[in-house]
A protein has these predicted regions:
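A short, conserved alpha-helix in the catalytic core of glycosyltransferases
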Residues: 145, 156-182, 217
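Short beta-strand-to-loop acidic/aromatic patch adjacent to the donor-nucleotide binding site
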Residues: 64, 69-84
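A conserved acidic beta->alpha catalytic loop
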Residues: 33-41, 81, 282-291
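Non-catalytic membrane-proximal stalk/linker segments that position and tether the catalytic domains
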Residues: 1, 6, 11-12, 58, ...
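Short, acidic, metal-binding catalytic loop of nucleotide-sugar glycosyltransferases
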Residues: 15-28, 265-275
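Cell-envelope/extracellular polymer assembly enzymes that use nucleotide-activated donors
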Residues: 1-4, 30, 165, 246-250, ...
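Conserved donor NDP-sugar-binding/catalytic core segment of glycosyltransferases
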Residues: 81, 85-119
């Protein structure tokens, strides 16, 4: 396996190398660095620098594909400090090989304000589109699938949405597998609740990012035959009658007991100078999602099963 880890501080690189060189499964260690970083730091022994512009760009993904000759690549997708377990890479590789998945991600621990907390992630579901789906920082990807992604003749170039576009591509060509084991730790830099984070897309500062995400999503929907051509639909007549609510927030869920309360509370807490409601579509969840929704009370909250 080849490792590709973002690096902003040379001490972090040295610390990672001291641990990773103990792994017999590691073929090459590459640090993703800026041109300025590379110009001011000597490359430590036992690794290489791969100069990138930003972690989420197409140039970075292409550079990763160009610099690997292993069967699998491990990409750290965030600027964070990773705590490697004794068998982190071995478990990723064993499960990737056993399942023949194009991508494997795992449960992990998070260091939040000096406290280590378990951070289980959820199973990836077919059709999932959220660009902020929590895979954790470490993605173990089949190298051939990565090469095939880069080789697509119609592949778009992105500054912000390349990791998202890669994940959507992988979901089309193979299985994205959730390894239900706590295999590593990472530092949590954003301590907001998940329900608060998911409204980042409405922040004007994220406009360019969101435009690229929407473009990648639209192209993905077209490739899986799920893109809706709205030209065939009647335009609603909003003057036909009085509507009690000006807008509705629709939240579809299935087995989301860990996050549904935060998401609904965040939606209900939005400030607006007009009336709106929140409609949660519960797709017959088999966990406590329905019970949690039943406990949430608000005049403008509707649950549909």
């Amino acid at each position: 396996i080849d490792l590709f880890l973002p690096c902003e501080y040379i001490d972090d690189a040295q610390n990672a190398l001291s641990v990773l060189h103990e792994y017999k499964t590691v073929q090459h260690i590459h640090f993703l660095v800026s041109a300025d970083f590379a110009a001011h730091h000597q490359v430590p022994e036992g690794c290489t620098f791969v100069i990138t512009d930003r972690l989420e760009s197409s140039n970075t993904i292409a550079s990763i594909a160009e610099n690997t000759d292993a069967d699998y690549v491990m990409i750290c997708t965030r600027h964070t400090t990773i705590g490697w377990g004794n068998n982190t890479l071995e478990r990723f590789l064993r499960v990737a090989d056993d399942t023949d998945a194009v991508m494997v991600y795992a449960d992990h621990y998070k260091m939040v304000e000096g406290k280590m907390e378990k951070h289980p992630v959820i199973d990836y579901q077919s059709g999932s589109l959220r660009d902020d789906f929590d895979f954790g920082s470490l993605w173990c990807i089949k190298a051939q699938a990565l090469a095939d992604y880069i080789a697509q003749p119609d592949r778009e170039e992105y500054q912000f949405a390349a990791l998202y576009d890669l994940r959507l591509y992988l979901s089309r060509v193979g299985e994205i597998f959730h390894l239900n084991e706590f295999l590593y730790s990472e530092a949590e830099l954003d301590t907001r609740k998940s329900g608060e984070k998911q409204f980042d897309y409405v922040n004007p500062r994220n406009r360019e990012v969101q435009i690229e995400m929407e473009k990648a999503c639209t192209q993905h929907l077209g490739k899986v035959g799920a893109l809706i051509d709205t030209t065939f639909y009647r335009q609603p007549d909003f003057g036909e009658q009085d509507f009690e609510y000006e807008a509705s927030v629709i939240i579809p869920v299935f087995n989301r007991e860990k996050t549904v309360a935060d998401a609904v509370k965040s939606a209900l807490g939005q400030k607006a100078n007009f009336k709106f409601n929140v409609i949660v579509v519960n797709n017959h969840s088999t966990d406590r999602t329905g019970e949690i929704l039943d406990e949430l009370k608000a005049d403008n909250l509707i649950q549909i099963v």
